[in-house]
Amino acid sequence: MTRRACAAAARHLIASLAGAVLLATPAGAHAVLVRSTPPGRATLAEKPDRVQLWFNERLEPAFSSVSVWSSAGTQVDAGDARVGPEDAKRLSVTLPPLPPGAYSVRYRVLSVDGHVVDSSFTFTIRR
């Protein structure tokens, strides 16, 4: 290969790599749960009156949900899950007075960038 051909190939390779870097989209661009009340795996002495989840991105209200389930498999929340009108990164649901036991919080959210996150965590109310 001539010197001129090597230089042309190197320029082409550099241009291709630069284009790939500039056009790449972030792989981790999706809503991440940053905190919750109650916290995951918490053991509580007090009965919570709601579950609140905060994410690192704004959520699409029509496609975001959270529910709370007993260890017997019964949904126990009030069914009023909603994205906060004053904070589009917060999702909450009201709880009735719950008896002691283990509970599972299940959530599915769609961030405004179009990524769906489906996950869960547990908490326990002490006897």
Predicted regions and their residues:
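Extended, polar beta-sheet/loop recognition surfaces of beta-rich domains
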Residues: 50-54, 112-127
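Aromatic sugar-binding surface patches on proteins
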Residues: 86-92
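Short, flexible loop/turn segments at beta-strand junctions in immunoglobulin-like
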Residues: 95-97
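Bacterial N-terminal signal peptides that target proteins for export
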Residues: 2-14
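N-terminal edge beta-strand
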Residues: 28-47
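A glycine-anchored, Pro-Gly-centered beta-turn/N-cap motif
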Residues: 99-108
